[in-house]
UniProtKB/Swiss-Prot annotation:
Organism: Danio rerio (Zebrafish)
Matching Pfam families: ubiquitin (PF00240)
Entry keywords, A to Z: Cytoplasm, Nucleus
Domain of life assignment: Eukaryota
Record localization: Nucleus; Cytoplasm, Cytosol; Nucleus, Nucleolus
Start and end residues of each stretch annotated as Disordered: 1-27, 172-295, 370-404, 448-485
InterPro entries noted in UniProt: Midnolin (IPR039336), Ubiquitin-like_dom (IPR000626), Ubiquitin-like_domsf (IPR029071)
PANTHER family (UniProt xref): MIDNOLIN
Record's compositionally biased regions (Low complexity): 176-190, 261-285, 387-400
Protein name: Midnolin
Residue span(s) of domain Ubiquitin-like: 28-102
GO cellular component: cytosol; nucleolus; nucleus
Keyword Chaperone set for record: no
Gene: midn
Length: 509
């Protein structure tokens, strides 16, 4: 049973003689005939399955394997080994592309687009991306829009399983998206691109040697928050809050980086969350002089550390996190599989729900309204909730008691980069805006109904001819007064009163 995976891996890399010596079974050749006229020959191991055959065809034809249907003697191949299905060397298979239409293909498109993009990657592309040798470019389809994403991890140091993520830029027109899901929670439209600028990285790392990676353009991105610290981890290259201690302790299977040189690490009284003032990724358990935050294990996942809106639809940022244990091998290294890439993408999409950064203009407006309101105290910045960190590291390390008293508006503007609005406050603001829109729409609808009623009543026939002109004059005056948008317009409807007056006058006559 151990010979089959080796035979498959060898044949996929092109070392056919070594495969025959290991497996002892010669590969079989299959003739693939497509209904569109394409014919080619495919060599694969004798123990190959239908799923593996579809994967090979998908990589060769650049077509998602879900859209491939294979027929052998008028029998559709769905699962199982090829030998068990009567397929031998020289067999002829018919390839029928699957065509989907209507709403059925729309339902599962977002999930399938990611898997289709990942399954079309070769083993070399996956290995080069996870080792940091080359970037990874994916073409994803979100709804009716195409999005091109390019990711790159730092070169993996010798002996260390750390993956260090670089810069994330997504281009496309998005309405209130969080990158990919402000971007996952909004819809990115048009073209999206994620590019990463490589940064210098130490080729070798010692457990007790401080390793600091400096960004090539530190001002391009806001400083980063804390980084999860269970191995292996993919961390950002943006600058952090505190520098590494002289001798950082070694965590199991991973080495931790800090991204900003010479910055004091002290807990901030304005931030109850330890992650906001001092990242534990650069503080060790043995050195307590600079940081008194206890080192604890963290859950797998990702955190978006910075998010910058460069232009409409063009976003950049950094995120970091730790891989799930299922994506690690026995030595703690990341598995060279598309499942690892899928886990990183899922962590990024999940992190967008916790990220609350927005373009500076919107944030500035919201904080100006919050700081000028009498209910919110201006001198102290609001506390940072879990998974949210300040956008500048140095001001948060200064105790709030030592800060001079400033004008509330000045303090508000200085706090824009120190804290992020809590989720409850954001939801309240959004709910208030939604209610205002609904009330405005209701008012407009009521106004239209009143106009229609006025026009309808003005054209209604009357049973008395002598005063018909007077009735029309009253209706015209009412229509002119309707433009003032009185809410008691119903009280001033003329028809019942006019009819009563008319009847009384008619009787008196």
């Amino acid at each position: 049973m151990d010979q089959h995976p080796s035979a498959r891996s060898c044949s996929s890399r092109g070392a056919a003689p070594s495969c025959e010596s290991v497996s002892g079974e010669p590969p079989m050749n299959l003739y693939i005939h497509s209904t569109t006229g394409t014919r080619f020959e495919l060599s694969l191991p004798a123990e190959e399955t239908v799923e593996g055959l579809k994967r090979r065809l998908s990589q060769r034809l650049k077509v998602p394997k879900e859209r491939l249907a294979l027929l052998h003697k008028e029998t559709r191949l769905s699962s199982g080994k090829l030998q068990d299905l009567g397929i031998t060397d020289g067999s002829k298979l018919t390839l029928v592309p699957t065509v989907e239409a209507g709403l059925m293909s729309q339902a599962s498109r977002p999930e399938q687009s990611v898997m289709q993009a990942l399954e079309s990657l070769t083993e070399t592309q996956v290995s080069d991306f996870l080792s940091g040798r080359s970037p990874l470019t994916l073409a994803l389809r979100v709804g009716d829009h195409m999005m091109f994403v390019q990711l790159q991890l730092a070169a993996q140091p010798s002996g260390g399983p750390q993956l260090q993520h670089r810069h994330l830029i997504s281009r496309g027109s998005s309405e209130g998206t969080t990158g990919l899901s402000h971007g996952a929670s909004g819809s990115a439209s048009g073209m999206a691109r994620v590019s990463h600028n490589p940064h210098p990285h130490h080729p070798h790392q010692h457990p007790h040697h401080p390793n600091t990676t400096l960004p090539s353009n530190p001002a391009a991105f806001p400083p980063s928050p804390s980084i999860p610290s269970i191995p292996p981890m993919y961390s950002t290259s943006a600058s952090g809050h505190c520098s590494p201690p002289p001798q950082p302790s070694q965590l199991p299977g991973s080495f931790l980086h800090s991204q900003q040189p010479s910055s004091a690490c002290a807990p901030s009284p304005s931030s109850p969350s330890p992650a906001a003032s001092c990242p534990e990724a650069s503080c060790s358990a043995k050195t307590s002089g600079n940081c008194n935050t206890p080192l604890r294990s963290r859950k797998p996942g990702a955190i978006i550390e910075s998010f910058v809106n460069h232009a409409p639809g063009v976003f950049s940022g950094t995120f970091s996190g730790t891989l799930h244990p299922n994506c690690q091998d026995s030595t703690g290294r990341p598995r060279r599989d598309i499942g690892t890439i899928l886990q990183i993408l899922n962590d990024l999409l999940s992190a967008t729900r916790h990220y609350q950064g927005m373009p500076p203009s919107l944030t500035q407006l919201r904080y100006q309204t919050q700081c000028t309101s009498p209910n919110s105290p201006a001198p102290s910045p609001p506390p940072s909730p879990p998974h949210t960190t300040g956008l500048t590291g140095l001001p948060t390390t200064v105790p709030s008691e030592t800060q001079p008293t400033l004008h509330p508006l000045v303090q508000c503007q200085s706090q824009i980069r120190m804290c992020k609005p809590p989720g409850d406050r954001l939801r309240q603001t959004e709910n208030r805006a939604t209610r205002c829109k609904v009330e405005r729409l209701q008012l407009l609808m009521q106004q239209k109904r009143l106009r229609r009623k006025a026009r309808r009543d003005s054209r209604a026939p009357y049973h008395w001819l002598p005063n018909r002109k007077a009735g029309r004059s009253n209706s015209n005056s009412s229509m002119s007064s309707e433009g003032s948008l009185d809410l008691d317009f119903e009280d001033s409807v003329w028809k019942p009163d006019v009819k009563a007056d008319m009847k009384s006058e008619f009787i008196m006559a």
